[in-house]
């Protein structure tokens, strides 16, 4: 194969690892790089409204496909994206951040270029990103550039953390051997140390053998680090009761007869709390124990027999086995577990959320009814995205269909995240299956931060469902502090004017205020098909919130007030 430009090499490599959409914005230090996207068949440039939204979109895309790329320009562009990149770092999402930077000669001369701080320091932004990246590289040598690109792509995928790649403008068009593309990037994990893994498996088997009431608890990193299949098989083979955390929604099949619900410490349903906390063995997969994921750290296991499977270590009771990756540990555990669980006597699992009682069609829509009812509308394989606030808490009441994807930023909690994430997820879903539905639930306050990205959805003909929960302001903040404070109020928008304002030609608008209107719309066979982009405004009472959010707000307020 003949020589190709370094820029084309980057995008060919990304295409090889199943990245088909590139997010970001143009800027004069990355324009030559962006030209190369159009030289690679099967790639498209999303062209976002701003860099923060682009970072959110890259995050949403990577949560579905395992890897994404964001391209920004030096200084002003890359810094605008860093909130989104920090969220990806916190929540284990593999985003490669590619930054077009000034030429090597301009940096050497310390020229006072635009987009700099005016002090000749061209490394300051790179250093900022280093704190929220698994690895970084500023390319300075064309000879080693291809191997550095390969290293960053591999690291981003394997660790499911962001990486930073700085590409000087003068290197993008330099040539590298095209033959390097013939050897694929190795995305496989290194095997576990056999002795350490054997000790883990033997110890876990002994704990299982001596337990009478074990449970499985699936969390965020079961999805992020690609052990959903192993976790589901663990449930199938053992028949142990299985639960998820808020961040674990979508990591196991919630239609499975052994699924018991969402465990959030003191915020759990009483029967779920009792089932998990009375267990004599907890098998925890991919735990991410943040405050909102644990009911403000209110886990209260009665047993000390807890096994935590993590991406790069396993913890058995008080012993930590560094370097024992859960992917292989679970796979090898599954080979030997059937003989150990033969004598297991199945215990009942908590009843799933009961259906709503019949109410008159004129009944005003409220959150408690909405989230229970939503399960009826969802379909197998849906991507369900819930914004920080009432949606992220309410969705825990909803039972997901099989093979659903759940996206919610419970740890980082940057309001407005889900608009961009919906765009990214919609691109990814379209690439997997054009009929796959992407469904967003976002509050009226959060939407105002990132609404511009709806225009990108329209531009590309994407067809998500955009459910806007309109309850007049920042409800979660009102519940925590300042229920009538002016700073928790927002300007009222005409939500049904948004799609045409952004230039949509084919779209649907709906406004729902009663349970009857919800039922009529969500049971309509045409509405159930993702044929056009839709915005559905849900009119809800002020201060209406899921019970779990009200309790969490009280816990958060108490935590904030502690001296």
From Swiss-Prot:
Keywords: Acetylation, Branched-chain amino acid catabolism, Cytoplasm, Decarboxylase, Isopeptide bond, Lyase, Magnesium, Metal-binding, Phenylalanine catabolism, Phosphoprotein, Thiamine pyrophosphate, Tryptophan catabolism, Ubl conjugation. Binds 1 Mg(2+) per subunit. The modification N-acetylserine is found at residue 2. It catalyses: pyruvate + H(+) = acetaldehyde + CO2; 3-methyl-2-oxobutanoate + H(+) = 2-methylpropanal + CO2; (S)-3-methyl-2-oxopentanoate + H(+) = 2-methylbutanal + CO2; indole-3-pyruvate + H(+) = indole-3-acetaldehyde + CO2. Thiamine diphosphate binds at residues 390, 413-415, 445-446, 471-476. Fusel oils and acyloins are important flavor and aroma compounds in yeast-fermented products contributing to the quality of beverages and food, e.g. fusel oils in whiskey, contrary to common believe, seem to alleviate hangover. In general they are desirable at low concentrations, whereas high concentrations may spoil the product. By adjusting growth conditions and substrate their production is sought to be influenced. Due to their broad substrate tolerance pyruvate decarboxylases are important biocatalysts for chemoenzymatic syntheses, both by fermentation and in vitro, e.g. Its cofactor is Mg(2+); thiamine diphosphate. It is found in: Cytoplasm. Disulfide bonds: none annotated. Its EC number is 4.1.1.-, 4.1.1.43, 4.1.1.72, 4.1.1.74. Present with 1525 molecules/cell in log phase SD medium. Minor of three pyruvate decarboxylases (PDC1, PDC5, PDC6) implicated in the nonoxidative conversion of pyruvate to acetaldehyde and carbon dioxide during alcoholic fermentation. Most of the produced acetaldehyde is subsequently reduced to ethanol, but some is required for cytosolic acetyl-CoA production for biosynthetic pathways. The enzyme is also one of five 2-oxo acid decarboxylases (PDC1, PDC5, PDC6, ARO10, and THI3) able to decarboxylate more complex 2-oxo acids (alpha-keto-acids) than pyruvate, which seem mainly involved in amino acid catabolism. Belongs to the TPP enzyme family. Homotetramer. PANTHER family: PYRUVATE DECARBOXYLASE, PYRUVATE DECARBOXYLASE ISOZYME 1-RELATED. This is Pyruvate decarboxylase isozyme 3. It comes from Saccharomyces cerevisiae (strain ATCC 204508 / S288c).
């Amino acid at each position: 194969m003949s020589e190709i430009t370094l820029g084309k090499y980057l995008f060919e490599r990304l295409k090889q690892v199943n990245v088909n959409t590139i997010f970001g914005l143009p800027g004069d230090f990355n324009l030559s790089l962006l030209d190369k996207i159009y030289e690679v068949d099967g790639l498209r440039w999303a062209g976002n409204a701003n860099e923060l939204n682009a970072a959110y979109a890259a995050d949403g895309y990577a949560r579905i496909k395992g890897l994404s790329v964001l391209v920004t320009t030096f200084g002003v562009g890359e810094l605008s994206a860093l909130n989104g990149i920090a969220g990806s770092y916190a929540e284990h999402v593999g985003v490669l951040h590619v930054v077009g930077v000034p030429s090597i000669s301009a940096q050497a001369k310390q020229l006072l270029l635009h987009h700099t701080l005016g002090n000749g320091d061209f490394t300051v932004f790179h250093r900022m990103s280093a704190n929220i990246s698994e690895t970084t590289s500023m390319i300075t040598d064309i000879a080693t550039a291809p191997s550095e690109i390969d290293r960053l792509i591999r690291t981003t995928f394997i660790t499911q953390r962001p990486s930073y790649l700085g590409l000087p403008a003068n290197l993008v068009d330099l040539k590298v051997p095209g033959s390097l593309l013939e050897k694929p990037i190795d995305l496989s994990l290194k095997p576990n140390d056999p002795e350490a893994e054997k000790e883990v498996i033997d110890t876990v088997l002994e704990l299982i053998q001596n337990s009478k009431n074990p449970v499985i608890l699936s969390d965020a990193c079961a999805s992020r680090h690609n052990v959903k299949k192993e976790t589901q098989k663990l449930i199938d083979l053992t028949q142990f009761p299985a639960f998820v955390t808020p961040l674990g929604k979508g990591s196991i099949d919630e239609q499975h007869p052994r699924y018991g619900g969402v465990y959030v410490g003191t915020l759990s349903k009483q029967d779920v709390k009792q089932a998990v906390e009375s267990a004599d063995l907890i098998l925890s997969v991919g735990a991410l124990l943040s405050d909102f994921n644990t009911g403000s750290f209110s886990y209260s296991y009665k047993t000390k027999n807890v096994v935590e499977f993590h991406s790069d270590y396993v913890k058995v009771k008080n012993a930590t086995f560094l370097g024992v990756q859960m992917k292989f540990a679970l796979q090898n555990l599954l080979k030997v577990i059937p003989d150990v669980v033969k004598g297991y006597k199945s215990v009942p699992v908590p009843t799933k959320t009961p259906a709503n009682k019949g109410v008159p069609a004129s009944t005003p829509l409220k959150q408690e009814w909405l989230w229970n009812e939503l399960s009826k509308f969802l379909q197998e394989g849906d991507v369900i995205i819930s914004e920080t606030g009432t949606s992220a808490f309410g969705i825990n009441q909803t039972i997901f269909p099989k093979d659903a994807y759940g996206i919610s930023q419970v740890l980082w909690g940057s309001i407005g995240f889900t608009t961009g994430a919906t765009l990214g997820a919609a691109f990814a879903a379209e690439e997997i299956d054009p009929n796959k539905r992407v469904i967003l639930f976002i509050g009226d306050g959060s939407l105002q931060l990132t609404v511009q990205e709806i225009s990108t959805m329209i531009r590309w003909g994407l067809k998500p469902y955009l459910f806007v929960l309109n309850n007049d302001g920042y409800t979660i903040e009102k519940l925590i502090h300042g229920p009538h404070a002016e700073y928790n109020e927002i300007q009222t928008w005409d939500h049904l004017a948004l799609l045409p304002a952004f230039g949509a030609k084919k779209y649907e608008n709906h406004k729902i205020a009663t349970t009857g209107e919800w039922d009529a719309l969500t049971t309509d066979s045409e509405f159930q098909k993702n044929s056009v982009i839709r915005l559905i405004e849900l009119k809800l009472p002020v201060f209406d919130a899921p019970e779990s959010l009200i309790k969490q707000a009280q816990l958060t307020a108490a935590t904030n007030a502690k001296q």
